[in-house]
């Protein structure tokens, strides 16, 4: 039984990673069709938030959280808005594979954060994996030097650190409870931040090509399922 749960957990993690990667890869199609990171990130927050609210309502699950947890979840929503916008901007600037490679340093960063704040130990295997991951990234950056943008790399680093923070802190809020209300609070705040940015700049860029719409819709769908 325990073995089955472990296998299921690994399968879920792999599946979520693949969905995120697919959603982020499709972002380039949306950009080529006329959209941009701000517009895409707004949709990637808003539609999953609406869908999750509907799911909770149909399930009869109150979406409320204790006050302290709610405040933390809303703060994580701001972090989520920042890291998602940074990731989608990195994908716009860098080759997709390189941007995603930088972003997927977040599991190592999550372990480091958990160890630094004293919530978990940092095992030697994680340290070794971190060294190998950063070595691989350094090699990739060296190989792709001609296509390298310092700004894009910084965006990718911000995205990885942001998701690491959200992963580390949200795990303490969720504990062994239902993660959906926490996720809803995070998505709701991220949606609000994105909408404010859209209103401030005064435009929302939708794709104007068929392939752009496929990329836009696919990115929203797959990233939403992953969340």
Model-based region annotation:
Residues 19-24, 53-99, 103, 109, ...:
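Specific transmembrane alpha-helical segments of multi-pass solute transporters/efflux pumps
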Residues 52-64, 108-122, 167-176, 227:
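C-terminal ends of transmembrane helices
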Residues 52, 74, 78-80, 113, ...:
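Hydrophobic transmembrane alpha-helices of multi-pass small-molecule transport proteins
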Residues 43, 99-105, 169-192, 224-227:
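Helix-helix packing/entry segments at the starts of transmembrane helices
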Residues 30, 40, 44, 90, ...:
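Hydrophobic/aromatic residues within transmembrane alpha-helices
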Residues 67-69, 100-103, 116-139, 146-153, ...:
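Loop-to-transmembrane alpha-helix entry segments
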Residues 1-43, 78, 82, 86, ...:
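Glycine-/small-residue-enriched transmembrane alpha-helix faces in small-molecule transporters
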Residues 47-51, 102-116, 131-132, 189-196:
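Alpha-helical transmembrane segments of compact multi-pass small-molecule transporters, enriched
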């Amino acid at each position: 039984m325990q073995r089955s749960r472990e296998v299921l957990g690994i399968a879920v993690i792999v599946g979520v990673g693949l969905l995120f990667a697919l959603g982020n890869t499709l972002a380039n199609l949306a950009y080529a069709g006329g959209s941009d990171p701000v517009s895409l990130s707004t949709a990637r927050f808003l539609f999953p938030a609406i869908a999750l609210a509907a799911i909770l309502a149909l399930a009869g699950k109150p979406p409320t959280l204790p006050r302290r947890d709610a405040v933390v979840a809303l703060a994580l929503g701001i972090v989520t808005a920042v890291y998602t916008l940074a990731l989608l901007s990195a994908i716009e600037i860098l080759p997709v594979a390189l941007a995603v490679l930088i972003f997927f340093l977040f599991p190592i960063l999550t372990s480091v954060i958990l160890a630094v704040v004293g919530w978990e130990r940092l095992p030697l295997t994680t340290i070794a994996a971190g060294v190998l991951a950063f070595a691989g990234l350094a090699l990739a950056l060296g190989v792709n030097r001609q296509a390298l943008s310092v700004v894009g790399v910084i965006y990718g680093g911000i995205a990885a650190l942001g998701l690491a923070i959200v992963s580390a802190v949200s795990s303490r809020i969720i504990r062994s409870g239902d993660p959906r209300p926490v996720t809803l609070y995070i998505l709701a705040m991220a949606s609000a931040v994105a909408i404010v940015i859209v209103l401030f700049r005064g435009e929302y860029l939708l794709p104007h090509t068929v392939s752009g719409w496929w990329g836009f819709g696919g990115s929203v769908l797959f990233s939403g399922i992953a969340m």
